[in-house]
Each structure stands twice: as structure tokens, then as C-alpha cells.
Amino acid sequence: MRLTNLTWPKAQEYFEKNDMVLISIGSIECHGRHMPLGTDTLIPDHLLEKIEKKSDVLIAPTIPYGSCQCLAPYPGTIDINGEVLYQFCRQIFLSLYRHGARKFVFLNGHGGNIKMIERLGMEFEDKGCLVAMLNWWLMAWDMNPAWKGGHGGGEETAAILGIDPSLVDKSEIGGELKFKHLSDNLKTTGFRSVEFKGVNVDIIRNTPHVTDSGWIGPDHPSTATEEWGKEMLETTANYIVDFMEEFKKVKLS
């Protein structure tokens, strides 16, 4: 059930009987040379399509933008300042709260949004609400450790292949991941992580200073298959439907 498709009397009718709303958020950012900029939004959107067929929970419009400062130099990336994003989402929550929403299920497609969602969760708990943050890619890891992946790696590439194979430019996947190290003894191991004497520390850099392509992770994009993506997306959507049914039962004080 989509909020955008309801008349206001129908919305009123929903909130008289229900207090849960499902919202998704993503980002528009680089995911390597082979992946669409909208990866983090396309995946939650696709999950919503599956969920809508199996659940009667009200679905609010997707928020397509996110906070992605470290990836901002890549052409096409749209970075929303963390405070601006928080205030924008807060206004959405306040409007829904006014109408009767008390349980918010935030389906998240982008790691850079996590701090903002946590902040909303703390604020709205003080108002008698609960905010569930569902980071789909982390949930998928728990469902099947073989699906574990990084940014623009096999996991996300498989998901996009499962949605629309034409969106993945396989000719741009390339060879092994090449990090840009700070020195012979300061070896880059991730977005921020640098290994020194067997210990990882964080050194904050823009992603083009870490790797050229923009994908990072232990799972090479070439390992992705359409079948993997379809199974992972179906399993994740089914889990979310089951979770929301259980979440409905929670009594708020």
C-alpha cells in the first residue's frame, strides 16, 4: 500500500487502525565503474515492490539521496550534508507521527545514512516511538555468509543483476582491486582503514585517494550472478515481511 496512491481519507483510515510505516532510503553515488549510480536506491526500491505484494504495511515514498561525502568527487554522485539529511527525514517522521505513526521501519541501502537513522531513532524513542533500521546488505550476510560483500563488489553487483542485468557494465569490472597505499608501511585495506604493524587504524580520505574505480571489498564483482541476486533479494524481502509482522506485536508504552 503506497502512501502516494492514497486519498487523505484512506490515509486517515489506515492510521486509525495501524501505527507502522515503511520508508526506504538510499543514495546516488559511485559504485565502481561497472555499477549504476543509483545502486543504493534501486535495491531498496526493488525490495519494496516485493514487500508490497505480501504486506499491508503503508509504504512512504523512497528517499533517493544520502550522505556520501567520501565519494562526492566521482561524477554523478550527489552528497547531502548529514545535518540537512537528518532535518529532512525528521520532518517526514514528524508529519507521519502527527498522523499516528509510532513504528517506523527504515529500509536502508547506504552505510553513510546509518548515523542519521540512529539519531532519529533516539529522538523518536523519546516520543514513544520505535525506529527499526534494516540495512539490507548486512541482513543478507546473516542470512547467508556467502553473500557477504563490500561496496560495489559481488553482493551489490549480484543484486543489480537480479533487478536488471542491463544496468551492469561488465566490460568495466576489470581485474583485482588496487589500493593506493600511503607508504610502504601504511597499507590501505578499506575505505578508511590502514594497516600498520598488523593493526588497522582509520585515516580519513576521499575514496579516489583510496582506489581509482570506487568499488571496495573482499568480493570481486566478477563473482556476481543474476541467480545469486534474485535469490538474495527474494530472501531479504520475505524476511522483512516476517519481521514487520512481529514488529506489529510490540506494545509501546
Task: Give the predicted meaning of each segment.
Residues 1-83, 87-103, 111-253:
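Extended, histidine- and acidic-residue-enriched regions that form the cofactor-binding/catalytic faces
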